[in-house]
Each structure stands twice: as C-alpha cells, then as structure tokens.
Amino acid sequence: MEQIAARVTYINLSPDELIQHAVKNGEGVLSSTGALAVTTGKRTGRSPKDRFIVKDEQTADQVAWGNINQPVEQRTFDQLWERALRYLSERAVYISHLQVGADDNYFLPLKVVTEFAWHNLFACDLFIRPSGDHANGKPSWVILSAPGLKTDPERDGVNSDGAVMINLSQRRVLLVGMPYAGEMKKAMFSVLNYLLPPHDVLPMHCAANAGQSGDVALFFGLSGTGKTTLSADPHRFLIGDDEHGWSATSVFNFEGGCYAKCIDLSQEREPMIWNAIRHGAIMENVVLDENGVPDYADARLTQNSRAAYPREHIPLRVENNRGRPPDAVLFLTCDLDGVLPPVALLTKEQAAYYFLSGYTALVGSTEVGSVKGVTSTFSTCFGAPFFPRPPTVYAELLMKRIEATGCQVYLVNTGWTGGAYGEGGERFSIPTTRAIVNAVLSGKLKEGPTEVLSGFNLTIPKSALGVDDHLLNPRKTWEDVSAYDARAQRLIQKFRENFEKFKVPAAIREAGPSDVH
C-alpha cells in the first residue's frame, strides 16, 4: 500500500468531520439545505483533453488509443506522481479507505488521498464505504488528488495546467490541478471499464432500479438525457444512477452514491433528488443567495451544477446495491431533430447498432469548453469518454447478455418531437416519458399492437397507457410530413456516416436505418 507522507494526515474521518474541516478550511459553506456548497473555479466539468492513460506493455494492444484515450509514457507519469507527493507532503491530507463495485467478486479496494476535505467527502458519498476489512487480500488502487498543484505543459508533457492520469498497471490514478470532483468518479469508472470485460462483465454507463418483485431495469444515456431523473422513480427501488456492471448472474452498482445535475431542479418534478440534497451532500457550483438558499435556475457558474449524495439519502433503494439480470433495457436518446419516436422495441442486432452509435445530444454538457446550448452527438456505448477498450468489445458483451437473458431493449427518445430543436419542435415532457417508462416496465408495451417506422425500420407501439397515441409515431406529430421525411433522411445519413468506422457483422450493420420511403 502506498505510503503518503504529509504535514498532517486525517484518516477515515466521518462525513460530519470532513464537512467541519471543509468549512474551517474555507473550502465551502453550509447552505440552507444543510448540504456543503462548493465552487470549482474555471473547471466546472470534465476536462477530456487533459485525460491520459499510461501506455505500457500491458495496455499497448488493449486500449483504443486516440483523442479520448490519450497515451502518456510511464516516465512522465512517475515524474508527476512524485511531484504531487512532494506537494502533498507539505500539507494536511485526507485519506479514506473505500471500494468501487458492490459485487464480492469484482470490487476494487480504493485508497483516496486528497488535498481538499470536500473531495474526500465526495469520495465517501460517491464510492462505497466498506463494512469492516473487506479487501479479501485484493491489492488496493490509489487516487491521489492535488487540485492546488498546477502542471506545466512543457515540463510535464500535458496540455494545460491540469491533468488526469490513469496508470492501469500500477493501480494508480493521479489528478493534478483538477478541482472538479467528478473527475475522480469518472477515472475509476474508466478503470472498471477496462478491467471487467475480460472477466465476462459488461460495464455500463447506465442507471438501474428494481420493482417490488425484484425486476430490474437499466437506463443507458449521456448526461442530461434522463438517467438520474427517470431512475429516481417513486414506485421503484434505486440501485444506482450512473455506473453498473452486468455479470452472468447480476447487475451491480459500481458506486455508493449519486451525482445529480441540479440545473432547474424542482421539488415538484424531482422530489427524490430535491430531498436528497441535505446534510452530508455536496452542492457543486450551485449559486446561493445571501441567505444560503440555492437557486437551481441560476446558471451563472455553469449549466453543469451538481449534487453529490450517498445512496442512503434515497429512501427507496435496494439495500445490497445490486439486483438480478435486467428484465428491460432502455437506451435514452435525446433527439434534437425531432424525428425519432418516443419509444421503439429493438431486436438484439438493433440494440448493438444503437449501442455502438450512441446517438443523443449534449444537454448542458459536462465537459469544460463545450459550446453553450445543445448539440447532437454520437457517443459510443452512450459514454465514449469512459471506455478504454475498442467499442466492439462492449457491444459483443451486450449482445451476449441479451441472448442469455432474453431481455427486451427499448430506444426511448427524451428529446424533441413535432419539429426540430429551435425550429418549432417541443421536448417530450417528463410526465410523458415517465408514462412510457411505466408502460415499458409493466411489460404491456411489448404485448400490444405495433407498426414499423419507415426509414429507421423501428418497431413502435400503436398505444401506450398514459400517452397520447398521436405522439407515438413522430411522422404524425409534424404538420409538414415532407419536412419530417427530409429531416429524417438527413439524420439517417449521419447514422450511416458515423457507423462506417465500425467493423461488425453484416446483421448488425443492416439493423440500422435505410432510406425513407
């Protein structure tokens, strides 16, 4: 285990103690909700251009290197790691012994070493606090977080004044100049996404919940498409809101908490999230008024304001943080063109096609430097920034799991209909999407009459309880059908161009869209 020398070392403090330290250190203030409110300066989201993976003998042929998985040499990593250790040796540091992964076979022990008390609280909220000594002889991973230390691109071989470096061979994650806490959780997500496929576990960027009878649903999607909102269901039990593994026998959470977007949060629309933001939680870049009351509609600091809280703040939760293999899988896509249906039933080949495509929108992007507003994107596996291996590795595992369980996969559009974004279209309301999700989870949607949507070749229901029938076929929601056809053809062409890069069996390629008739 890595030995950390520091001026003062605080080990395994309670959340209350970490909050006291954070306030005393001037890292944040207590809000009217009781949650700790912090700001992160210019870095209010992930910094994908500053994320690196050490390229060595073990990883050279296993990682899909490129703009997302940028290589860095072992020597460069070692030098920066040593610099971070020297920097922290002159300061008080906070250390917590945690774990990622709620499955006894696949969890990783994790030692989190942070300069900021609130970063350690974040780790305690988001990762899993083990009961007793649960390491089972497994070697521990180490996160080293030094946000006050800045990098020099010329000296340190990086791109800016901050860097995230993942060393898969040495079980180390280094964060320098990175005050945005989400970098810690996404770094460990990337680690699990690399480690688990060889163990026949599909890692997923998805939320998961369970019904009264134990039936499990998965919600895949990029940030802002509805994973956290739709999985926080008042009639179901939450497993997790963001990162899970699907083994031959179960679905299990990687985390022990939630990291919810706060922009425009309302008690009426999202009561479970609203009520979870209390003492023990963290509000990141949420604007407070002079009385410490959060204004969730104020995007002055960022569109990507966040709340981190432990699962224990959600009353309806699955206690052991895992469930059986899923009965329903939902791909949440936010279609800006307004041409996709609110729900479609996918074959396993279509599931692989849309999983690899990952078509959606960047809604209030989580990335630093992103264009304000909304733009469409193709994000492989509904989470391209977090998957180190080639995308087909994950797609093949997904198809294997679908075949083994027979679970139904659905494409659910949480975006626009009746026209494109900014061109007369309207976004599906949360109540409409919830009604669709309820129809999916009841099992009734797949039993009713269906039709095929031309061009996309998607099987869509003719009726769904609680949803206006005319909304189910997007072609019928446009006043000008020829305008719909033209817009649909444009999106179909984008799908085809994006898919050219994948080497897949013909059955998967042919499951994609064809020309509009």
From Swiss-Prot:
It catalyses: oxaloacetate + ATP = phosphoenolpyruvate + ADP + CO2. GO terms for molecular function: ATP binding; metal ion binding; phosphoenolpyruvate carboxykinase (ATP) activity. GO terms for cellular component: cytosol. Mn(2+) binds at residues 186, 205, 242. It comes from the Bacteria. Keywords: ATP-binding, Cytoplasm, Decarboxylase, Gluconeogenesis, Lyase, Manganese, Metal-binding, Nucleotide-binding. Pathway: Carbohydrate biosynthesis; gluconeogenesis. CDD domains: PEPCK_ATP. One of its GO terms (biological process) is gluconeogenesis. It holds the Pfam family PEPCK_ATP. It is found in: Cytoplasm. Its EC number is 4.1.1.49. Signal peptide: none annotated. InterPro entries: PEP_carboxykinase_ATP, PEP_carboxykinase_C, PEP_carboxykinase_N, PEPCK_ATP_CS. ATP binds at residues 186, 205, 221-229, 270, 306, 433. Coiled coil: none annotated. Disulfide bonds: none annotated. Substrate binds at residues 46, 180, 186, 306. Involved in the gluconeogenesis. Catalyzes the conversion of oxaloacetate (OAA) to phosphoenolpyruvate (PEP) through direct phosphoryl transfer between the nucleoside triphosphate and OAA. Belongs to the phosphoenolpyruvate carboxykinase (ATP) family. This is Phosphoenolpyruvate carboxykinase (ATP). It comes from Coxiella burnetii (strain Dugway 5J108-111).
